[in-house]
Amino acid sequence: MEDFRITIASLPDRENLVAEISYKNKQVAEINQETNNLIIQIYSYKDNGYWEFSLEEFQKVIEEAKQKLIAVG
């Protein structure tokens, strides 16, 4: 999971904090709490048309980002 990074951020276009998920310094996804549910937005990869990495690893990163976001409110 060393290629992934999770950043909890306050963005000007969001009321609540978000969890940004990056892979090799490029943003892959964002988890937000703008509604009563957690929502994930997955971004396309401009250079290659798609992202490719281990499903198990990505699931772990998503869960870690979710837990960090919930912990900070």
Language model regions located:
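Negatively charged, low-complexity tracts enriched in Asp/Glu with abundant Ser/Thr
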Residues: M1-E20
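Poly-acidic low-complexity segments
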Residues: D3-T7, N37, S54, K66
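A short, structured beta-strand/loop element
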Residues: N16-D47
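Mixed-charge, Lys/Arg-enriched low-complexity segments
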Residues: Q41-G73
